[in-house]
């Protein structure tokens, strides 16, 4: 809802031409509440024709996201890994958001994968992957299996989405996946995400939900990363301090996943193997990661989550990926978020968020905040990186 401002006082503009926009907007909001109708009202909802057109333009991604959530099915495969209990996913809030979920066994997926052996589409999928990877095609021997898996997932989506228009996938990737399928699914996850079917790792249901929202709002490919590790002092001193704004070392961290970030969001990419798994398994069953440093530029780190007791909670933070080499492995980048250290302690830890965060490329916090508010996240449960001097409720004033 927006209202037309008074345009002029000339020629009786405030006599016969007065629109009384302030009064009208108040009455509109009153009647919306009476009827329990949700509506988006801009921060300052009164303006000229041009300003109101801009407000409508800002509303478009919000409206798209709300529509998309009401037409989304999440398809999951397998339970969370026992030794990594970190992404609890009460499903009640999914239905409150208008989202449907279909939970499947890994065994169902494995059966379908085996039935796709020799599928006539596999060579075409391999050719696509070879073209995308280019010189980064370091594991050509695994491409046929990856193409078979990709076709399996795409066919599953078509067969199971029902009346729903959109699909996101929460996939399993360990501990039994690699030994039974013979590869890791990271690269396929990245490719489907780039096609508009976000795929999360480790059966992270609210992770793929967050990715989906980011995809719709930004109209671009997103990724899902671990808020993973600190930046070593030597990298900070050599490549960041005094060169990239006023970031302290506590404002920086590394966002990492094994290899699920799309090639379009990497500065360079190579097909490799999952190094962590390969410490205990043969390398050949861990092939399938897409590795490289994430492209530098503005980002929004965010997540929508149902807590273990089924309350909706979210966080949003603007930041950037710095143009600094990571010297590490996986799909990884050096992130900088103003006041990240405090945000990490008093939003992420205090709010009991899991380690996965969705990353949208660009600054989309304004739209995401409105989406979260519209779909029912209490405003006091939407965390953000508060500037220096603005204390979090749990922050020790004497620290």
Predicted regions and their residues:
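A glycine-rich phosphate-binding loop feature that marks nucleotide/adenosyl-phosphate handling sites
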Residues: 168-175, 226-242, 387-393
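Short beta-strand elements of ligand-binding domains
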Residues: 1-5, 169
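Extended hydrophobic packing segments that form well-structured cores
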Residues: 276-399
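C-terminal catalytic subdomain
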Residues: 193-329
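Short, solvent-exposed amphipathic alpha-helical segments in soluble enzyme
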Residues: 89-96, 184-189, 374-377
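Cap/lid and interdomain-hinge subdomains that line or gate substrate/regulatory clefts
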Residues: 6-125, 132-135
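Anion-binding alpha/beta catalytic cores of soluble intermediary-metabolism enzymes, centered on
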Residues: 6-55, 62, 178-233
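Long, internal scaffold/assembly segments composed of regular secondary structure
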Residues: 122-217
């Amino acid at each position: 809802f927006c209202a037309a401002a008074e345009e002029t006082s000339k020629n009786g503009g405030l006599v016969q031409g007065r629109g009384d926009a302030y009064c009208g907007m108040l009455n509109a909001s009153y009647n919306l509440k009476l009827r329990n109708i949700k509506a988006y009202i801009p921060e300052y909802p009164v303006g000229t024709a041009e300003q109101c057109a801009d407000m409508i333009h800002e509303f478009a991604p919000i409206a798209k996201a709300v529509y998309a959530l009401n037409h989304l099915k999440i398809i999951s495969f397998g339970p969370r890994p026992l030794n990594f209990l970190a992404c609890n996913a009460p499903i009640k809030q999914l239905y409150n958001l208008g989202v449907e979920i279909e939970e499947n066994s890994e065994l169902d997926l494995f059966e379908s994968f085996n039935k796709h052996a020799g599928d006539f589409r596999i060579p075409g999928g391999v050719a696509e992957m070879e073209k995308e990877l280019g010189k980064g095609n370091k594991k050509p021997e695994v491409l046929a299996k990856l193409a078979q898996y990709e076709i399996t997932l795409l066919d599953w989506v078509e067969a199971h989405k029902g009346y729903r228009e959109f699909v996101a996938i929460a996939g399993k990737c360990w501990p039994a996946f690699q030994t039974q399928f013979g590869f890791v699914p990271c690269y396929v996850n990245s490719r489907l995400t780039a096609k508009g079917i976000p795929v999360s790792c480790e059966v992270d249901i609210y992770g793929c939900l967050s990715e989906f929202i980011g995809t719709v709002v930004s109209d671009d490919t997103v990724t899902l990363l671990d808020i993973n590790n600190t930046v070593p002092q030597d990298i900070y001193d050599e490549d960041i301090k005094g060169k990239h704004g006023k970031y302290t070392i506590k404002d920086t961290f590394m966002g990492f996943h094994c290899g699920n970030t799309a090639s379009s969001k990497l500065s360079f990419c190579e097909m490799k193997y999952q190094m962590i798994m390969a410490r205990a398994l043969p390398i050949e069953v861990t092939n399938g990661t897409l590795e490289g440093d994430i492209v530098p530029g503005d980002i929004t780190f965010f997540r929508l989550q149902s807590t273990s007791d089924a309350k909706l909670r979210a966080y949003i933070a603007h930041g950037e990926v710095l143009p600094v080499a990571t010297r590490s492995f996986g799909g990884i980048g050096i992130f900088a978020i103003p006041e990240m250290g405090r945000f990490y302690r008093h939003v992420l830890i205090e709010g009991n968020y899991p380690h996965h965060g969705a990353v949208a490329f660009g600054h989309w916090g304004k739209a995401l905040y409105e989406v979260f508010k519209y779909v029912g996240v209490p405003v006091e449960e939407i965390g953000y990186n508060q500037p220096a001097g603005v204390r979090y409720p749990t922050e020790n004033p004497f620290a």
